[in-house]
Each structure stands twice: as C-alpha cells, then as structure tokens.
Amino acid sequence: MHGRDFLFTVGALAACAVPVHSREGIAFLEGDLTQLTQPGNGDNRATYMPDGKSLLFVSSRSGRSQIFRMRPNGGDAQLVHESKANDYGRVAPSPDGMRLCFSSDRDGENAVYVLDLDSGAVARVSDPAYWSFGPTWSSRDLIAYFSKKGGNQINTWTVRPDGADAKQITHRPGESRQPWWSPDGSTLALSVDNGNGAFQIWLSAEDGANARAITKEGNWQQPFWSPDGRRIAVSAKLDKSVFRILIMDAEGGDIREIAQPDNADNVHPAWSPDRRSIVFTSSKEKSGALWRFSFAA
C-alpha cells in the first residue's frame, strides 16, 4: 500500500483512532468517519429511507437475518418486520417510503418480496421458479433484482411492485447482478462477471438496452448512485488486498477514495438522500459493523 496515513476519530460507539490511507493514483476525500454499530451482530447492507431520517439494514442480532431500522447517527435498532424466516440482502424502500422490497427464504428458497409498512402485508413479486435476490426500487415504480434458475448463470430482471410484467433484461453468460437504479429511474448500474472471477460495473437502460462497461480492471461491485445521478459509489478491490469504498463519476472516471477502516473489507456503500454521507459495512473476520463517512463541508 502506498500514500499517506490519516487518523480519524471514531464517534458514536468507539473512542479510538482508525487508520485510513489513500492509494497512489487515487485522490483521497477527507471527512468524518463514524462507527454506527458494534461488530458481532452481522449488521450489513444499510440503505437510507427516502426522507433521510432513518437507516434500514439487515442483521442477525435476533438469531436470524432480519430487517432493522435505526437513526442515521446510530443508537437503538428496531425490528421492522417479525418473521420466522431469514430476510436477506439490501432492503430498498419505495419512492414514498411506504413499502420495502427485500429478499427472503420464507417460501423455502430466496425470492423477492414487497412489504407494506402500514399493514404488514408481504407479497412475493419474483417468479417462484427462480432463485432471486438483491432488489432495488426505481423512481418510476419498477423493481430490479438478479435471479437464476439452475446452473451458475445469473441475470437481472425487472418487475412491477404487484408482481406483474416480469422481464429478464440481461442475457449474458456468467453473472449480471447487484443492480441499482439511477435517481431518475432511466439507468441501471450492474456488477457483471468479466469471466475471470472479477466483476466490472456496467450501465444499461431499464430494458437492458445500450449496455456498456464503465470500468475495465480490478474487481468492482455493489454500485450505488448518488442522489443527483452524477456519481456512483462502489466497493472495489484493485489489488490483492481488501475491498475499499470508492466513488467515481457516472462514466467511470474521476475516482476518489473515502476515509474508511483499514485492513478490512469495506462493502455495500449507500448514499444519503442529501449527498452528505455514505454508509457502508466494514468487516473483519466476517464480523460486520456499520460505518458512516460524512463529506467535509
């Protein structure tokens, strides 16, 4: 590793200094780094609610993977929905924040569901013949997720929140996964297998047309658009060390690295609605905790 060393004081839960660094050739963004949860509970894949007043995340703190909610600054977490099943993956709210889409094994195999927060009603929206995971909800009221049926080929699908009009929009060999909508709902960012075990970030229209790669080397995963649609946060491994949170412009250029814990895999970035912070999971020895990077004013 190359570059300068920086020390940031960790707030909320920890009272220690965490070393972070900048990589040679990638600009370093200064800001405040805050640990939101303690490791050991399997807290991961956080996403902000549309109003920015709370975070959704999945955690195994109750004995199985379930959906929780807490304030953006950390603190007590509340169970969102009681379930005897495991609810996995990133939770994506509807644009109005009244419903959530998520993955669960409640019917025996992973599928995508929609939860109405007022009534508590849960409805399956993905094809029961397919293993499905990782939904994201667009501003145009369309859900995208990735799915497979036997073998190792994984493709991205879209479906309406009522389960209608399901369409497979990628048709590549290998894996096309981890879709995330641009703020205007016109474009998907995807992680696409490049054939050697690593992934690149691709962009496509909502119907899968005009697909193209915007990264070329390394291993780039878990894209998440900024609220203004100008930048994308990713988890990337550019050498043989660990995954780091990077941000880039929507064409794959102007790459920056945020402050984050060192010697750990830092994954699943999510931008706040006001663009002022990014929350992510930092994992050491498979024990994840949620952290937040706040951009310098």
Which residues fall in each region the model found?
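N-terminal export signals
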Residues: 5-21
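Beta-strand-rich domains and repeat architectures in extracellular enzymes and scaffolds
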Residues: 35-65
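Blade-level signature of beta-propeller repeat domains, shared across WD40, Kelch, NHL, RCC1
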Residues: 270-297
